[in-house]
Amino acid sequence: MSLIICYYGKNGAVIGGDRRQIFFRGSEENRKILEEKLYSGEIKSEEELYKLAEKLNIKIIIEDDREKVRKISDSVVCGEVRSLGIDAKRRRVYATKGKCAIVDILNDTVTNQTIKEGFGIVVLGNRFLKKKAEEELKRTAKLFPMMPIQQIEDAIKEIFEKLKWHPTVSKEYDIYSVNKYEKNFEEVIKKDIESLFKYREQLRKQLIDFGKVMSIVNKIVKNGEIGVIKDGKLHLYDDYIAIDKIDPNPKVFKVVDVEGNFKDGDIVVIENGDMKIKGTNEKVTTKYIIIHK
């Protein structure tokens, strides 16, 4: 769903990228049919895309808020296209004055890295957009090394303006440029990719923690006999535990302090979320959360 155009040469580096993401939900077979027609250029408008998606019973979500290109420093720009599924596949282009790198990443592994020097143009995107952009560049790109950076920016903007009719490209786009050479180019790339891997690790931990929290929430007792009063405290039956808070790693208790009008030997029940003494309407309260073990 992307279009990224990157120029690098003796006069600097320029990168432009659209912001569109399209998500497909439905049968894999029909998704492939829709994607093939979309990326081949057969579908020529959002209206046509929505109509065919409805016909194929595919739900599509279009978002135009992903910044695919960025300026890492005053000497390096970067762009990324990605495919997220069971595996996360990324292709990144980094550029500085007179140099660029193309990096392929699979999940948390760099699978390929190519460094190019001198001047050139890198176009990333689906095959239809890539072909159209390259056709436009043939007319002007040979003059880029002799142009001021601003003029190159304008030329790349013009290509985005010409292609934004296509449903895989957003109407808005981002352009960044630098005119300095980064002597530690490969080190900058390494650190930037390491930050991606750290982010992915943090995200994994957050998802694990979220899963733990949801598991706890789903185990909160709504109904049932949970324990008995002994020595003025609630002693929970084997199937239950008490926790101090909804958290991935809460403190766990089998005996807890409770408040209410009760006596030793009373059985405590939970009915529709309310804790009380069995056979009475005497409510019992505690600062703890009772969950299934």
UniProtKB/Swiss-Prot annotation:
It comes from the Archaea. Coiled coil: none annotated. This is Uncharacterized protein MJ0548. It comes from Methanocaldococcus jannaschii (strain ATCC 43067 / DSM 2661 / JAL-1 / JCM 10045 / NBRC 100440) (Methanococcus jannaschii). The lineage of its organism: Archaea, Methanobacteriati, Methanobacteriota, Methanomada group, Methanococci.
